[in-house]
Amino acid sequence: METQPQQPPPPPVAEKLNPKLEKELNLESLKTRAVSLAKAIARILEDFDAYGRTNTTPKWQDILGQYSMVNLELFNIVEEVKRVSNAFVVLPKNVNAMNAAILPVMLSSKLLPEMETDDNAKREQLLQGVQSLPIPMQIERLKARMDMIAAACENAERVLADTRKAYGFGTRQGPSMLPTMDKGQAAKIQEQEKMLRDAVNDGKGTQLPPDQRQITTALPPHLADVLIINDAGKIALPGQSNNINNQGMMQVSGTQFVGRSAASPSGPNFDNTTSPLPYSNSPRATGMVNVPSPQHQIQQQQFQQQQQRSKLMQLPQHQQQQLLAQQQQQLRQSSMQGLGQSQIPALHDMHGQAQQKFQTSHGQHQMPYSQPMGAHQQFQARQLSGGHIQHSMSQGQLNPAMNRHLNQFSGGANSALFTSAQGSPSSQMIPNMSSMQSQTLVPRMQQFGVSGTNPQRSHSSQMLGDQMFNTSGMMQTQQTQIQQSQQQQQQQQQGGYGNMQTNQQSLQPNNMMQNAQQRHQNPQ
């Protein structure tokens, strides 16, 4: 028991710092400053403890002043330690519960075990090929390897510097400009960019310079019949052109009167085989078509006339007189032919309605007309409501039809023509019908597809004496009234147009007075 050593183990030898480093660090003064700082912090904590016990309000101004002094002193101490701490202060890679408390004050003159392990592994890897050589040879080999690494670093730095110069990296002016394009092309691109920028920002229209415009000299086939190109290369509508020949004006007026749709590339054109499209306000109109009615066409014509008048006011006076004379002559020719072509099929349509209503025997001949008559059935639907013919058609019912087709004439000629058409006797009307050209009537009758044993009637006088009105029985009286009403309507409408072509003197004021007297003597 006595032989057992009861002496404590020898105390570990205290590790001393390098004397030079210790002198530079000046640990004595640093220790004094740290102790005074600790006392100041302890005094502040005691003051807070006293405030908490006595439940008194602390003087925050004094406390903040003391805190600022303590904070400044601590900052000064840390800055002094930092100057020499790089030589012996080591920050470990891992922090655990054991060394967490001593990390702020860990001072050592040697590396931590994990850092020593990494250094040993790197050293062995570096000396792996030269360990068997003597020490001087190892030093030379290591120096040669260091020189090679330094040369590689210099080459890499040179390449990086050249690259920065070429692309302007790290400079204020940015990358250098690439080889520029042609000056003319660059100016065009800049001008186009400016126009687009103005159009987007200010809403200005893009105006191309004359050298970049594409002047259209020819139209596609489906637009050649509708649009007209003038000498300046601009596309104008037919109604806006002032120099239109008689044939072009006749084609435009025929399209407006008949209601025929213009040719389109998406579908075939049936100008001579099908009847016109129905109007948008017609009883037979559907949602698939939206052809404007005569009222809308009249409004469009009035708007175009106003535009033409404004253009005429800008021309010299002698040119205005010449253009006005040409337009009046073209309007008379086109209107006479257009009205004659548009009214006769309407009468034929009413003729077919009378036949369909008063068929009584199976052996009677039938004349089936083609069903789609959109442009003419508007007249039929308004005058003959629902296919039922009114037995006594008064003059007041015929006036709207006459007014609708005579609206395009001027005021004096319109009233004179209408009064002469109302008061002319039957003996004068029927001979005038023979003066109308039968060539315009035959193709229209061919469109309506006359079938059966009846020959094609090319004249209105043959229609009045047709055998389908010779029905016997109880319908004789009604057929006679229908014949009279149709004769009266045809005489009043077609006779008025015949007077336009053959007897223009009937439009004088004295004829208007005679017609007015005849209307008062023979009231309907």
Swiss-Prot record:
Recorded coiled-coil stretches: 137-162
Segments of skewed composition (Low complexity)? 295-315, 474-505
- What is one GO biological process annotated to this record? regulation of flower development
Spell out the InterPro entries in the cross-references.
Answer: MED8_plant (IPR038795)
Q: Which UniProt keywords apply?
A: Acetylation, Coiled coil, Nucleus, Transcription, Transcription regulation
Q: Per the record, where are the segments of Polar residues compositional bias?
A: 506-524
Q: What happens when the gene is disrupted?
A: Increased number of leaves and shorter petioles under vegetative conditions. Late-flowering phenotype when grown under both long-day and short-day conditions. Increased sensitivity to necrotrophic pathogens.
- N-acetylmethionine PTM positions: 1
* Presence of the UniProt keyword Ion transport in the record: no
Question: Where is region (Disordered) located?
Answer: 291-315, 474-524
**From which domain of life does this come?**
Eukaryota
Gene Ontology cellular component annotations, sorted alphabetically: mediator complex
> Can the keyword Acetylation be found in this entry's annotation?
yes
Localization terms from the record: Nucleus
User: In which family does this protein belong, per the annotation?
Assistant: Belongs to the Mediator complex subunit 8 family.
Q: What does this protein do?
A: Component of the Mediator complex, a coactivator involved in the regulated transcription of nearly all RNA polymerase II-dependent genes. Mediator functions as a bridge to convey information from gene-specific regulatory proteins to the basal RNA polymerase II transcription machinery. The Mediator complex, having a compact conformation in its free form, is recruited to promoters by direct interactions with regulatory proteins and serves for the assembly of a functional preinitiation complex with RNA polymerase II and the general transcription factors.
Known partners and oligomeric status: Component of the Mediator complex.
The miscellaneous remark of the record is: Named seth after the brother and murderer of the Egyptian fertility god Osiris.
Q: What is this protein called?
A: Mediator of RNA polymerase II transcription subunit 8
Origin organism is Arabidopsis thaliana
